[in-house]
Amino acid sequence: MTETAELTAATDADVLAVAREQVLEQGVGLTQEQVLRVLQLPDDRLEELLALAHEVRMRWCGPEVEVEGIISLKTGGCPEDCHFCSQSGLFASPVRSAWLDIPSLVEAAKQTAKSGATEFCIVAAVRGPDERLLAQVAAGIEAIRNEVDIQIACSLGMLTQEQVDRLSAMGVHRYNHNLETAKSHFPNVVTTHSWEERWDTLKMVREAGMEVCCGGILGMGETLEQRAEFAANLAELEPDEVPLNFLNPRPGTPFGDLEVLPASDALRAVAAFRLALPRTMLRFAGGREITLGDLGAKQGILGGINAVIVGNYLTTLGRPAEADLELLDDLQMPIKALNSSL
């Protein structure tokens, strides 16, 4: 059978039957076209889809769930115009620029570790780090290492090669830089820098030996076709971790009046991304509380998710850490231990 004939046969077949053979049995992620067909499935097949995504997660990732906490080292005043973000200095947002001191950073790391988390991510609202920020990050990492047994990640915007090398030398375990959305939709979301600039940073991070964390936000006006495109973009990048956020419209931002993504669409997307990325850590991130609520959080963890951010996010409230940990315990999902992630 030719490649074209095989594609036609796959298109004609039921996409979940194809996924069961291709993804569950062979570990090969769905293509962009196949992901689109998953995203187009009706609500009456959602339960079946989530069950398959859970099987894939258990088969290729195992039962453990990685827990992470995040903290904003530098909040607000960002010069970029990411339309979803209340930290941009270009919008009429209530968020104001502020820096966190090192003792507060260390205390946040301690509290994160107490929750059972193995990863602590230091975040800054910047286009990219300047010398002041890099010095503060270096001091913070050293202070945390002296008191807390936890892996450290950073999210500091776009990097130069020299900055990548410096962060690697500091012992940064994982670097987060989200592509945010499909390449074709990105100009509708950000105009002050390009999708390619973000991609270039991610490639340098990987080449330096740090783990790559890259995901985005769903519900920013993208089409289903673009949602499938985004999954394919991520599959090409092959990140170690994909955080999935759902738009929580922020007052004063260009996306402040967008509607929240329906829960069924969000869950379909979670499962579709799992089927596209069978071996990748897929993390519940911002916006899940407003989009999915408590029941949706459970469905997501039983529908492909195998990592969570506990506690609050950068400018919005998250679920209490205790609620997530209790849910994982109820579902008999063990929290990934620090020694198993080294």
Curated annotation (Swiss-Prot):
InterPro entries: Aldolase_TIM, BATS_dom, Biotin_synth/BioAB, Biotin_synthase, Elp3/MiaA/NifB-like_rSAM, rSAM. It comes from the Bacteria. It is an enzyme of class 2 (transferase). Keywords: 2Fe-2S, 4Fe-4S, Biotin biosynthesis, Iron, Iron-sulfur, Metal-binding, S-adenosyl-L-methionine, Transferase. Pathway: Cofactor biosynthesis; biotin biosynthesis; biotin from 7,8-diaminononanoate: step 2/2. [2Fe-2S] cluster binds at C121, C154, C213, R283. [4Fe-4S] cluster binds at C78, C82, C85. Its cofactor is [4Fe-4S] cluster; [2Fe-2S] cluster. It holds the Pfam family BATS. This is Biotin synthase. Coiled coil: none annotated. Catalyzes the conversion of dethiobiotin (DTB) to biotin by the insertion of a sulfur atom into dethiobiotin via a radical-based mechanism. Homodimer. GO terms for molecular function: 2 iron, 2 sulfur cluster binding; 4 iron, 4 sulfur cluster binding; biotin synthase activity; iron ion binding. Belongs to the radical SAM superfamily. Biotin synthase family. Its EC number is 2.8.1.6. The gene is bioB. It catalyses: (4R,5S)-dethiobiotin + (sulfur carrier)-SH + 2 reduced [2Fe-2S]-[ferredoxin] + 2 S-adenosyl-L-methionine = (sulfur carrier)-H + biotin + 2 5'-deoxyadenosine + 2 L-methionine + 2 oxidized [2Fe-2S]-[ferredoxin]. The lineage of its organism: Bacteria, Bacillati, Actinomycetota, Actinomycetes, Mycobacteriales. Residues 63-288 form the Radical SAM core domain. Binds 1 [4Fe-4S] cluster. The cluster is coordinated with 3 cysteines and an exchangeable S-adenosyl-L-methionine. One of its GO terms (biological process) is biotin biosynthetic process. PANTHER family: BIOTIN SYNTHASE, BIOTIN SYNTHASE, MITOCHONDRIAL.
